[in-house]
């Protein structure tokens, strides 16, 4: 029984999963491998073409009305670590019960090297793997801009400390679009 049947089809007959990745070593390649496995199982995958922040994944899952989301990250852990975080259709991390069920399924896999995964480019050609629409990123940016009007009104100085993380490009775009030239 595959992940689609065990977990995703319980949530939606035609499941869609959004996958994002951060700036860590091999995160993009890891995201593509997960996309290959899910798409091979018949899951529609929406894959970011470039690194994204975790809040962007949560937003994209809700915006696209996806069944689930996968974030390739090790969060605050050392840079040589990597891992995945799974999100539900509400854009939040899985609740303990759902997380435990998925963990049991994964732990029951006898030989991970025998998991079937078709060619990435073929799956893209067949549109089983699609790119994250730019409209989703633009909607996210607009949502953030709508929330930060108070900062703009008070001409506050902004200090951005993404520490080489994924939020730097989008945060800089948002601040520039809001007319901030007084940020570090």
Please provide the spans of the model-predicted regions.
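Conserved small/polar residues in nucleotide/adenosyl-binding loops
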Residues: 1-5
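Short, contiguous clusters of charged residues that form electrostatic/catalytic patches at enzyme active sites
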Residues: 6, 55, 59, 138-142, ...
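Generic non-transmembrane alpha-helical segments
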Residues: 6-7, 37, 105-109
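Short, flexible coil/linker segments at domain boundaries that flank nucleotide/cofactor-interacting
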Residues: 8-14, 150-155
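Gly/Ala-rich phosphate-binding loop of Rossmann-like dinucleotide-binding domains
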Residues: 9, 39, 176
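Residue-level marker of positions within ordered structural domains that often coincide
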Residues: 9, 24, 62, 107, ...
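Ferredoxin-reductase
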Residues: 12-90
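Gly/Ser/Thr-enriched, mixed-charge loops and adjacent short helices
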Residues: 82-184
């Amino acid at each position: 029984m595959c992940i689609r049947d065990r977990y995703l089809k319980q949530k939606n007959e035609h499941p869609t999963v959004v996958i994002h990745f951060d700036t860590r070593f091999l995160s993009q390649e890891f995201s593509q491998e997960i996309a290959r496995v899910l798409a091979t199982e018949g899951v529609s995958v929406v894959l970011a073409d470039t690194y994204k922040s975790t809040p962007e994944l949560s937003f994209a899952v809700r915006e696209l009305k996806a069944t689930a989301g996968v974030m390739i990250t090790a969060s605050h852990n050392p840079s040589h670590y990597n891992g995945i975080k799974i999100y539900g259709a509400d854009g939040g991390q899985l609740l303990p019960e759902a997380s435990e069920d998925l963990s049991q399924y994964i732990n029951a896999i006898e030989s991970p090297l025998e998991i079937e995964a078709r060619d990435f480019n073929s799956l893209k050609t067949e549109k089983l793997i699609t790119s994250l629409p730019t409209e989703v990123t633009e909607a996210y940016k607009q949502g953030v801009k709508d929330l930060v009007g108070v900062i703009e009104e008070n001409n506050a100085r902004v200090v951005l400390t993404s520490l080489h993380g994924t939020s730097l490009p989008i945060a800089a775009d948002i601040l520039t679009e809001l007319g901030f030239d007084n940020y570090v």
